[in-house]
Amino acid sequence: MLNEFIAIRRDLHQIPETGYKELKTQAYLLDYISKLPNEFLEIKKWRTGILVLVKGTNPGKTIGYRTDIDALPITEETGLPFESKHAGNMHACGHDLHMSIALGVLTHFASKPAKDNLLFVFQPAEEGPGGAKPIMESAEFSEWRPDTIYGLHIAPEYKVGQIAIKPGLLFANTSELFISFKGKGGHAAYPHLANDMVVAASAFVGQMQTIISRNIDPMDSAVITIGRIHGGEIQNVIAETAFLDGTIRTLSPETMEIVWTRLKQLAKGWEEAYQCEVEFHPGSDYYQVDNDPVETEEFIHFLEEQYPESYVPARSAMTGEDFGYFLSEIKGFMFWLGVDSEYSLHHAKLSPKEEAIPFAIDVLVNFLESK
C-alpha cells in the first residue's frame, strides 16, 4: 500500500504553481488540514500561504516549522505517471516533498500535541519574488511569532536516510540581476551609424567576471551567472536594445555590496564606451541561511543518538533560500535531506526518491517531541 504522504506528494506534484499563484495548492492543503482533529488547531490564510498553530499542552514557547509551496516555470521531462498537469510548470525544486513532509508532521501533532506550541508555515513564492520576508512582516505571523524555527531542503546528491547540516552559513546570499542596454539600432550593413547593444551586452557579460577574479578576496567566494541574454529582433537589423538576466551569489552581505558597487561602476563606463544607457531593474534578494550554532549542535547530537548513520557534515553552498530571512531574526536551522536523484535541483528530469518522505517525517516528529 502506498504511503499516505507519498500519495499526497504525487497529488501536489501534478498541480505546480509559481509564486503567489498557488491557489490550487493552497486549496489542496486547506482541504487536507480541515479534516485533521481540530481541538488544538488554529488556521490562518496569508495570501496564497497558510499558517497553522498547534496549541501545546503546557506551552512555554512556540516552535516554528516552515515549508515552501511554490513551483518553477519549467516544462517537466520526467515521464512519471503523476507528472505535472500544468504545462510549463514543475515542482523541480522538491517543494512537493517539502509540503508532504510538513503535512505528515502536522498530522502527528494534531492528534498528539507537544508540550509547546507548534507553528507550521506554508510559505508561497520562495522561488520568487520571495515570500519569506513579507509573511514575516504580516500581522498573521506576528501574532504567532515563534521563538525558534526549522526547515529542510531536499538534496539530490545525498542518499535517502542522510541528513547534511552544519552550524553557521549553509546557503549563500543571492540577488537577482536584470540589466537592460539601450543604444541606437540600424541597418546591419551600416554598423558605424548605430550603437550595437548585442556587442555591448556580450562584452559586459565577459567583463563582469573580472569583478569575481579581481575584486573579491580569493579566500572568499562569489558567483555571477547570466542565465538569459536577449537582443534584437531580426538578423539584418543592429539591435537597439539588449537584456541580461542572471544571479549573484556571495558568502556575506559585505561581498554582495562589493559586487553591486563594481557592477554599477562598470555600467557607467559602458555607457561612455558604447554610447548607450545601462539600467539595473529590481529583482528578489535573499539573505544567507545562517544556522544557529547552539540549535544546530543540539540537532546533530540528536541525530548521532537516534539516527547514527544519518548525519553528514555539510559544506556551505551557493544555493539561495529565502528561509534566511527567518533565521536573520529567529534562531533555528535548515538541513539538507537526501533524496538520491541523478538530476539536480531545477532540472526538468529531477526525480527524488520518495522513501525520503516517511524518513523525514519520522526524524522531525521525534526531534520536535524531544524539545
From Swiss-Prot:
Q: In which pathway does it act?
A: Amino-acid biosynthesis; L-lysine biosynthesis via DAP pathway; LL-2,6-diaminopimelate from (S)-tetrahydrodipicolinate (acetylase route): step 3/3
In terms of InterPro entries, this protein maps to: AcetylDAP_deacetylase, Amidohydrolase, Bact_exopeptidase_dim_dom, Peptidase_M20, Peptidase_M20_dimer
- Taxonomic superkingdom: Bacteria
Keyword presence, Transmembrane: no
- The answer to whether the entry has keyword Zinc-finger is no
Record-annotated active site: D68, E127 (proton acceptor)
Molecular function in Gene Ontology: N-acetyldiaminopimelate deacetylase activity
Which top class of enzyme applies to this chain? hydrolase
Keyword list (alphabetical) reads:
Amino-acid biosynthesis, Diaminopimelate biosynthesis, Hydrolase, Lysine biosynthesis
What processes in GO biological process is this protein linked to? diaminopimelate biosynthetic process; lysine biosynthetic process via diaminopimelate
Please give the catalytic activity noted in the UniProt record: N-acetyl-(2S,6S)-2,6-diaminopimelate + H2O = (2S,6S)-2,6-diaminopimelate + acetate
EC number(s) on record? 3.5.1.47
Which family does the record assign?
Belongs to the peptidase M20A family. N-acetyldiaminopimelate deacetylase subfamily.
Known function: Catalyzes the conversion of N-acetyl-diaminopimelate to diaminopimelate and acetate.
Q: Which PANTHER family does the UniProt entry name for this protein? A: N-ACETYLDIAMINOPIMELATE DEACETYLASE, PEPTIDASE M20 FAMILY MEMBER
The protein's name in its UniProt record:
N-acetyldiaminopimelate deacetylase
